[in-house]
Amino acid sequence: MTLFVMDISPLQQSFGLRCKELRSESGFSQEQFANRIDMDRSYYASIEVGRRNVSLSNLCKIANGFDMTIAALMTGVTEKTD
C-alpha cells in the first residue's frame, strides 16, 4: 500500500506570501505585526518566507492579527456581512 505524501513546502511558501501581502497591505512592518500578534519577529519572518510549518495556535494569532477568519486567511475569500 502506498501512502500519499504531500510536499508541504509549496503550501508553506504560498501561505507565507499571503501573510506578507496582507501585512504589507495593512501597512505593518514585520516587527509591528509580530508585536501585534505576540510573536517573535524572526519567527514571523520565517513564516513569510515559507520556512515554518505553522501551528494551529499561530494560525489563529495571524488570522486575528488581520481581523479575519482562518478560512479567509487561507483562501482569500471573505464572508459577506449585512
Residue ranges and their predicted role:
Residues 57-72:
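DNA major-groove recognition helix of helix-turn-helix/homeodomain DNA-binding modules
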Residues 27-49:
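Short alpha-helical DNA-recognition segment
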Residues 17, 27-28, 54-57:
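Residue-level signal for the short linker/turn that defines the boundary of a DNA-recognition helix
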Residues 20, 31, 60:
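Residues within the helices of the helix-turn-helix
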Residues 24, 35, 64:
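Alpha-helical residues within the helix-turn-helix
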Residues 1-4, 64, 74-82:
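Short, charged recognition helix plus adjacent turn
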Residues 2-24:
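A short, Lys/Arg-rich alpha-helix, primarily the initiator
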